[in-house]
């Protein structure tokens, strides 16, 4: 259910701006998206897990705020990121 260290390192390599970049907004959005996707799969078999559903909503809100920040500062980076992650635009 949780994201593995290897998968996190792979996401950091893929979305990092520089080699040692682990905290940029794009990297954080990619990691949050992976966690959200894992929780979504979890809910397919555990639909009554309401405590985890609250955690999912918190993660989605955190990702939405990060995407709003990226959209406000660099619209081209935002459009590229949402297409790579396969998510819809933030309203």
Swiss-Prot record:
Gene3D superfamilies referenced in this protein's UniProt entry, alphabetically: 6.10.250.3130, S15/NS1, RNA-binding
InterPro entries the record matches: Ribosomal_uS15, Ribosomal_uS15_bac-type, uS15_NS1_RNA-bd_sf
GO cellular component terms attached to this protein's record: cytosolic small ribosomal subunit
MF annotations from Gene Ontology: rRNA binding; structural constituent of ribosome
GO biological process: translation
Pfam family, one: Ribosomal_S15
Protein keywords: Ribonucleoprotein, Ribosomal protein, RNA-binding, rRNA-binding
HAMAP family xref list: Ribosomal_uS15_B
Oligomeric form and interacting partners: Part of the 30S ribosomal subunit. Forms a bridge to the 50S subunit in the 70S ribosome, contacting the 23S rRNA.
PANTHER family found in the cross-reference section: RIBOSOMAL PROTEIN S15, BACTERIAL AND ORGANELLAR (PTHR23321), SMALL RIBOSOMAL SUBUNIT PROTEIN US15M (PTHR23321:SF26)
Family: Belongs to the universal ribosomal protein uS15 family.
Function text: One of the primary rRNA binding proteins, it binds directly to 16S rRNA where it helps nucleate assembly of the platform of the 30S subunit by binding and bridging several RNA helices of the 16S rRNA. Forms an intersubunit bridge (bridge B4) with the 23S rRNA of the 50S subunit in the ribosome.
Protein name as annotated: Small ribosomal subunit protein uS15
Organism encoding this protein: Rickettsia canadensis (strain McKiel)
Name of the encoding gene: rpsO
